[in-house]
Structures are given as C-alpha cells and as structure tokens.
Amino acid sequence: SLAIKRLNQTDDMQIVIEQSLLTSKYMMGVPDSNRDRLLSYLNYAKLKNKVDKVQFYKELFYKAYMLENERAYIHTDKLLDGNSWYDADRTARICQKYVELVTFRGRLKTAVTNAEKMKLNKEIKTEIQVLESEEI
C-alpha cells in the first residue's frame, strides 16, 4: 500500500492522507507477470525523478497507480516510459488528469441513465485529449 501524505495545516503533529493506493495481492514464489511488471517500474534504477524524496515518492506512487488502473487509458505505457517524470509540475498535471479519468470511468460503470452516461463519456473524452496533449 502507498499513500500521498502531508502535514495537517492546523496541527503540525498530525498527518493527512490525500490519496491512498492498495495494490493487488501477489503470491510470493509463484511467477506472475503483473507483479514482475510492477516491480520493474518501481525499481530504483528505473525511477527518473530523484531530485528529492517527495518527488521520488510521488513518482513511485503514481506509477503504481497507473499500473493498477492501466485499463483506463490505452497509452498508459507511454506515460510510464516517458520523460515527463523529470518535470514535477507536468507530472502533477498528468497524474491529476489520470486520476480524474479513472474516477470518471468508475462512475460510468455505475451510471444508470443515458444522460449521465453521455455526460461522463464527454468528460472521459476531454480527459483523454488533455492527456494526449501532455504526452511527448
């Protein structure tokens, strides 16, 4: 499990969890391509932004998040392998849009009316266009 945390703004002795992620369970000793893929992307040598601990951990968190939700966006591999991880601001924008895309896709599954589905599909299309414009 991973989480993006920060100090509470009113009480410096408390920590606030902004986002959390629980990865899938993987059996130890049993070959698993998904586990191997996750571990390869989270390998220290493959992580790109090692400027400070915060950016390093955020890259770790968001790569794990993207791998857990890679069905949400067809070009997730391009995002994971791209060089946008060197730029903290760009990474934050991309990851925020990716989280919104995953949220909209989840809400689309539970939508009942066609009006809701159409609205969510428009939002999904917009998020995908933004992600594609951020890619290199």
Task: Identify what each model region corresponds to.
Residues 1-78:
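Selected N-terminal structured segments and early membrane-anchoring regions
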Residues 69, 77, 81-82, 88-136:
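Alpha-helical oligomerization segments
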